């Protein structure tokens, strides 16, 4: 009996010691997370200003394949800790897999005002060295993206980030996406969701959509399905904070010329877009995991409001009933983009007449009447000034377009690129070049109640 009692005491003592060690490890881990904030701040300048300061590496990318920064436990901590080191990235937990019981209309309402990570992963060109991801990422003027940049967007009040991706940039001849490219996109998605924003991932400047489909439809579908099959598989367990968008500004000039084409050609072009969108929904829904219920974004023909309302655009049949439509707003083009007169139009230097407001309201009312009021949510996936115009009028246009979209229950997603006409956000310095427009956006956003965002 004495021996048994003695052994029992020893076991209890050893258990107590082991419990203490585990507890100590947790405390040390927490301290490490807090201390990395200083490291993150010290490295930020190097990461944004030099190629060697990239926030990702081959080793890091392979380690992040099965990890995510968007779990409920890590969302609050990631704001104060760096994910720019290999140690931090490999310690990430599995992605949050929560799919809330909310409609797509409720989700779009909760998406608030969004912003694009433009001219970054959508950059493309034959002159770009395709040996490394960063060559595409920085080709059109963006620095290498860091989590500090994503965090700055979130802290400014943006609730959604659209991540345009040209998957064809790093795609094999048999349509396999390069692992490093996929890993990098996943890392960006993790940062976006980890900082409390919705992430929209699409096919952007994949020119085969406009070029291959009209000449070889079967091969076009094969390539399109191959890309979305891989993307769907990689992200199938992500929560409903990730949205897939079928395409970007798709159209078929080889089938139908918008200005000289026939009605029959027009119907053929729209039918093809409708069939591609249907195949997109069918493929994602059949891919397993949370994709069976994922909220999806359907691109209208050229994402044009007029085309979306001409009676030929058809929303896909979706067993989950979770689709929204995407259009863009760059109207009037002579004001938004033209800096010199052309044969087809004269550059405008002012905006804000009663006729201008009537045009804005008319186009947005089309989307509200024909979509929102009929239960189909609307996301204006892009809008911004594309030319340097007098600030007084340029600011007015951007503010009024944001307000008009928002007040109609739709989600405005601003097109932000580096060196843009309005110099909206500088990713290198993390500063806002147009605080007046930003403040107006924040004021507009505040008109919605997001206090119970998980249930609204």
Can you name each region flagged by the protein language model?
Residues 221-354, 365-386, 407-410:
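Active-site region of glycoside hydrolase catalytic domains
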Residues 29-92:
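Long, intrinsically disordered low-complexity tandem-repeat segments
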Residues 89-160:
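N-terminal carbohydrate-binding accessory modules
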Residues 357-432:
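Substrate-binding cleft of secreted/luminal carbohydrate-active enzymes
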Residues 22-24:
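Bacterial signal peptide processing site
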Residues 140-160, 171, 175-205, 212-246, ...:
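An active-site-proximal structural segment forming one wall of the substrate-binding cleft
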Residues 118-145, 173-177, 215-216, 334-359, ...:
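Acidic/histidine-rich helix-loop elements
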Residues 17-20:
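C-terminal motif of bacterial Sec signal peptides marking the signal peptidase cleavage site
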């Amino acid at each position: 009996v004495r021996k048994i009692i003695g052994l029992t005491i020893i076991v209890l003592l050893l258990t107590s010691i082991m419990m203490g060690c585990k507890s100590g490890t947790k405390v040390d881990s927490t301290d490490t997370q807090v201390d990395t904030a200083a490291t993150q701040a010290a490295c930020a300048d190097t990461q944004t200003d030099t190629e060697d300061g990239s926030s990702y590496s081959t080793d890091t990318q392979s380690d992040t394949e099965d990890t995510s920064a968007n779990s409920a436990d890590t969302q609050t901590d990631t704001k104060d800790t760096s994910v720019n080191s290999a140690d931090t990235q490999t310690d990430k937990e599995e992605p949050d897999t929560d799919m809330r019981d909310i409609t797509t209309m409720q989700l779009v309402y909760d998406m608030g005002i969004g912003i694009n990570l433009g001219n970054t992963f959508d950059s493309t060109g034959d002159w770009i060295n395709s040996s490394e991801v960063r060559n595409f990422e920085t080709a059109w003027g963006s620095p290498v993206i860091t989590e500090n940049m994503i965090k700055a967007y979130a802290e400014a009040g943006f609730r959604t980030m659209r991540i345009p991706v040209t998957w064809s940039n790093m795609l094999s001849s048999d349509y396999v996406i390069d692992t490093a490219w996929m890993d990098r996109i996943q890392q960006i998605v993790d940062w976006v969701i980890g900082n409390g924003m919705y992430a929209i991932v699409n096919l952007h400047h994949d020119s085969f959509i406009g070029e291959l489909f009209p000449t070889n439809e079967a091969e076009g579908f094969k390539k399109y399905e191959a890309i979305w099959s891989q993307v769907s598989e990689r992200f199938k367990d992500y929560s409903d904070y990730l949205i897939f968008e079928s395409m970007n500004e798709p159209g078929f000039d080889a089938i139908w010329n918008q200005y000289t084409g026939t009605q029959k050609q027009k119907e053929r072009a729209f039918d093809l877009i409708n069939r591609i969108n249907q195949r997109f929904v069918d493929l994602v829904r059949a891919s397993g995991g949370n994709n069976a219920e994922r909220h999806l974004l359907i691109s209208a023909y050229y994402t044009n409001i007029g085309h979306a309302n001409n009676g030929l655009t058809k929303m896909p049949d979706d067993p989950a009933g979770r689709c929204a439509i995407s259009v863009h707003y760059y109207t009037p083009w002579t004001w938004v983009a033209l800096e010199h007169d052309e044969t087809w139009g004269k550059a405008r230097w002012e905006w804000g007449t009663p006729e201008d407001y009537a045009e804005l309201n008319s186009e947005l009312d089309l989307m509200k009447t024909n979509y929102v009021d009929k239960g189909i949510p609307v996301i204006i996936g892009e809008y911004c000034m594309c030319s340097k115009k007098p600030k007084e009028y340029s600011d007015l246009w951007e503010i009024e377009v944001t307000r008009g979209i928002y007040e109609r229950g739709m989600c405005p997603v601003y097109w932000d690129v580096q060196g843009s006409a309005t110099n909206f956000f500088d990713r290198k310095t993390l500063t806002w070049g147009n605080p007046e427009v930003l403040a107006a956006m924040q004021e507009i956003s505040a008109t919605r109640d997001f206090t119970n965002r998980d249930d609204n």
